[in-house]
Amino acid sequence: MTQRRAMLILHGKQALNEDVRDAVADKRKQGWELDVRLTWEAGDAQRLVSEALAAGHRHIVAGGGDGTLRDIAEALALAETSASLTILPLGTANDFARAAGVPLEVSKALQLMDVAPRAVDLGEVGGKLFLNMATGGFGSQVTANTSEDLKKVLGGAAYLFTGLTRFSELHSAHGELTGPDFHWRGDLLALGIGNGRQAGGGHELCPTALADDGLLDISILPAPQEVVGTLRSLLEGGLGIDNMFIRARLPWVELKSTQGLDINLDGEPLSGEDLRFEARPGALHVHLPADSPLLGGAPKLNRPD
């Protein structure tokens, strides 16, 4: 019988979470040898993954938000290990988990430890890996709230422009995207490059993305002058602009902008004038629901731990 052994790497803020304590106790009663380690500062997740693998663990549970999940997923992929990952979503947005159908209730999420893992892709850019999505919004100043008027107009892209209170504050950047049989150049307001489907707390920028197809979904919100100039009339007419996105599905895409680009990788900032995004097919083994919307039919791996 395969030894049921795992390590839960838990964000330090969740140390006193009674639901987590109860769920861990339940898994131990079910026969799991489940160790728990806490993160305290930047770099801890990566260090704890290394320690877990060195100790012989082949199953890691990521307990935290999208940032914690990204850190642990990246560390596992860079270790080139066959160890698998269970997602325990404890953050505010939990964008990848929600899109993947992972339960938000702690005990139900940990039930996925007992299902077979699936091979899923990662995205890579600038030497960094991401599980969910790379996003970019231009001319935005991030604060706590987004104008309700802008939300009505921008729909799923609204969170990229957090802090804008007037239409005159919308600014675009000139960008060029190139990939296999794909080329687009122009002014853009927003960009999503997704392995997952949503970002910013439930905004579906890449609504049909699959995490196991070896491809990245590209969503561009163009900003020709006539579009920027008519946002107010779009609002008055009750129209959103989600349907104005240009979309593609590519194994890689190069993004260039002489103005520089501010990119968010599941909470990790990245900037540059010339960036290449690539899919890393099957780079991670994740325990997901059999009916996860992010799975397109790739075969199950032959074990749960």
From Swiss-Prot:
Q: Where does ATP bind?
A: T39, G65, D66, G67, T68, L69, R70, D71, T92
Give UniProt keywords alphabetically: ATP-binding, Cytoplasm, Kinase, Lipid biosynthesis, Lipid metabolism, Magnesium, Metal-binding, Nucleotide-binding, Phospholipid biosynthesis, Phospholipid metabolism, Transferase
Record-level GO BP terms? phospholipid biosynthetic process
For the protein in the UniProt heading, the enzyme class is: transferase
Positions that bind Mg(2+):
L210, D213, L215
This chain's protein is named: Probable lipid kinase YegS-like
Function, as annotated: Probably phosphorylates lipids; the in vivo substrate is unknown.
Principal place where this protein is found?
Answer: cytoplasm
As for subcellular location, the record says: Cytoplasm
